[in-house]
């Protein structure tokens, strides 16, 4: 088996557009941990069932700092090693190296016998030189990783090097770092593992906060993801007649969108919510086992993940037959007005919380006007009230990027209590959810759930709706559906 193979290509790819952006990101995180070794794993393959793995997706911090997307690269680890000031990459404090398992020779057992990494099984793998050229990042064989991580580990007070680890990504790397810490501790039997967890958590926090403001390359990737997602919504409308005829019509809707995600992107950014009728009042309904019925609405919350791993996150609530009823339109318009109020305050200098508060003011006023609130809108909006949350229990916005709920480890003072800044990308997604079993409201409201969600880029001139090409108003939605169904 080892002979009579054509030569392996040694051609190296051009330097990727993302390479310079990823280098700047590494420099930024280097500034925060100048004398410490930083270890950021991509993560291992995850088992779905027995010997079948899920498709691989690297950890988002790893992807952000390397520029790698799609399914690159199981078990890889990015190590930023501290060096003398000014001697690091681009004059920084660290030298970065990407450790991964390169292609195996065709004379090796791995090539034809390893179903997880052998090229006979999974296709061509990159060489060290190819990734180095593509990423502008030094590479090394993963067999050298243990020495790279554990060398000189110890307490800085006695000349050792401290490590910070992106924890709970790869348990093998967790164990390697923990063992190195234990073996070099002054008093290993009384190690403060809680303090070490806090040390590592600061790295996760910093990596998360680094993504609060997107660079130009990231913004372009968000636009790619949004465009594919809009195309997926068009596919959904075209699939509605088949969905109505099927006993699990929600799955038909889900499947139509999934096909677009795989054709135009890498994958789904998250499990699609395709919620017909009363299922739309279940916030994370993704079983998608229900029917899609004429006269009802279907709430679809979906996003395509681009090959760069950046995802969109868009929600529309569509009338299945192409036209909203009077009650459906009434609820939809209230949610749309709340979204527009949130848009109006999504400007640089305002607090992130202001976006949610603006939407809640509109919804509380509308619920009071309809006679649904047991108190005034003012009382409901007070900290002691919150009665409106019976029908709108979630936040209006979250950051968006490599994760659908991006920057989740960022400190509250920079996220929820932070100031809106140019370059941020986040959602605006108010909703109203009136459950079938809610006896506090008149019957005509029940069984209707509406959410409208768009992806917003903050610029110096205010918010730009990246998903504006997907109709939002009731009239525009109806006209759009008629055009696609004609």
Predicted segment positions?
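Active-site neighborhoods and metal-handling regions in enzymes and metal-associated proteins
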Residues: 1-486
